[in-house]
Amino acid sequence: MQTNKQPKQQFSEKQFIAFVFNYIAGFGFISVVMTMFDVGPFSYLVLGLTSFAILGVVLSFSRLSVLCGNSAYGGSYLIAKKAVGTNSKTKRFFVFLSGWNVSLTGSFNGVVIPAVLIFSFADIPVVKANNNIIIGLLVGGFLLFGLLTFISLFGLKINKKAIFYFAVIKWIVVIGGFILGIYLIGTTNGKGFVENNLIGTRENIDFFKIIFISLALTIAFAGTEDLASITPDVKSNNLRKCFLIAFGCVVLLYLVGFVIISGLDGIRGYGLALGNKDPKAINNYGSIYRLVGGVPLLVIYGLGLLVNSLASRLSMTITTARKYVALAQDGFLPSFLAKTNKHNEYHHAVLISNLMTLLVMLIMVIIPFLPDHNNNNNSLFNAIEQLVTVTIEMAAAISLIQYFITFIFFFMIFAKKENQKLIPLWEKVSYVISFALVSVLLFVPLFPFNQWTVFNTFKIVVLICFYLLGVGFFGYAEWKNKNKYQLMNNNS
């Protein structure tokens, strides 16, 4: 029987910390870490700037989790309600905009799933060169997407078990790469530690390149804004501690991984005769496996990347569905989205979440048909790679928009006299610095007037269209519920 009651809490504190750590950390970092060394010694600056910016976001979410509590879904959406209230149309619009924006991140991140089989085995030459293999892997990716949608309908209890088993394989591959990396460092006597920390012949190291690489690194922290939306499922009286412990573990892992990888020789072909086409070039994390064990180890890596993507999508479905639930409970979206099935899962919200992802996929298909000077040979693999790159950049932009909005609401809440005493001076300073960093990382790449391409225009147009879709839902909700907003005020 369907119901819209609140499901019982499914996570203990330890389980939630592990869920947060597994949700954020892993392949997001290793997929972009190689690009950090394009700026030589400034790679440390990139890691520091990005980590500090996200730390401010985590601190704000953890601080607000104390103030707003964990009795309802919504995360940053609840923060917006706390900051401005819902007693006027303008206030309700900004509250809805916050909730709608954060719900888009899962849809854009989910686009990568059908392509994951291709990238899992991309280091095998025959995969890139054979369009039939690429199409077959793409079809397999869509079948996996459907399977994950089916699994996610069985509630957190089943999802937690699936995520756990997927996570075990994922971390074997990640840590295995670190160990193999140490082995490779030994074979070159640590040459990379010097090579990767010199500017040398690297070209065009400037402010914009550092900012763009920092933006790419925010992908390694993707999902931070999602996790506040599932706090009602956590049995904890100290969510702030949970967030900070998990984030500390993520940063520690990244620091260890960064130090190890910085010792590798030939990252992205630097210093090699044939550049990134040299057989010894380490162009991605899978190259570490290939250099040590050839194709057999590379296949193991590919399976690990695949499993990680499956776990990420399951986790993403859990968080994204609950964002729709919060909007539905307040009348902005149809009320049936707040109903649960016999497994205590918001099955309608899960299905809508995946339908939104499919909608994004259909729109992103336009990308390969846009003029691209880097794909003159019309390679199918390069076209899919460009599609995924642009989509991930859009997902990163949406996350940064959410951080930006949340900071504004955060400052509004703690500008009130009764809340000012809750925050020590050092924490206030960190928020201001983090807000400045988030602003730079958001607006400079989104409007790179010195390097504008057709892809920048495409990204902005698509984002505007999705926001207009949200405005349509808001307008309909205003018309339908114009006499019912007292219910929302009672929940504010």
UniProtKB/Swiss-Prot annotation:
Keyword terms of this UniProt record: Cell membrane, Membrane, Transmembrane, Transmembrane helix
Disruption phenotype: Not essential, it can be deleted.
Main location group: membrane
Subcellular location: Cell membrane
Transmembrane segments: 16-36, 39-59, 107-127, 133-153, 162-182, 210-230, 243-263, 291-311, 350-370, 394-414, 429-449, 454-474
Superkingdom classification of source: Bacteria
Keyword Disulfide bond found: no
InterPro entries referenced in this protein's UniProt entry, alphabetically: AA-permease/SLC12A_dom, APC_superfamily
Membrane topology: Multi-pass membrane protein
Any single biological process term in GO: transmembrane transport
GO cellular component labels: plasma membrane
Family membership noted in the UniProt record: To M.genitalium MG225.
Protein name: Uncharacterized protein MG226
Species of the source: Mycoplasma genitalium (strain ATCC 33530 / DSM 19775 / NCTC 10195 / G37)
Origin organism lineage: Bacteria, Bacillati, Mycoplasmatota, Mycoplasmoidales, Mycoplasmoidaceae
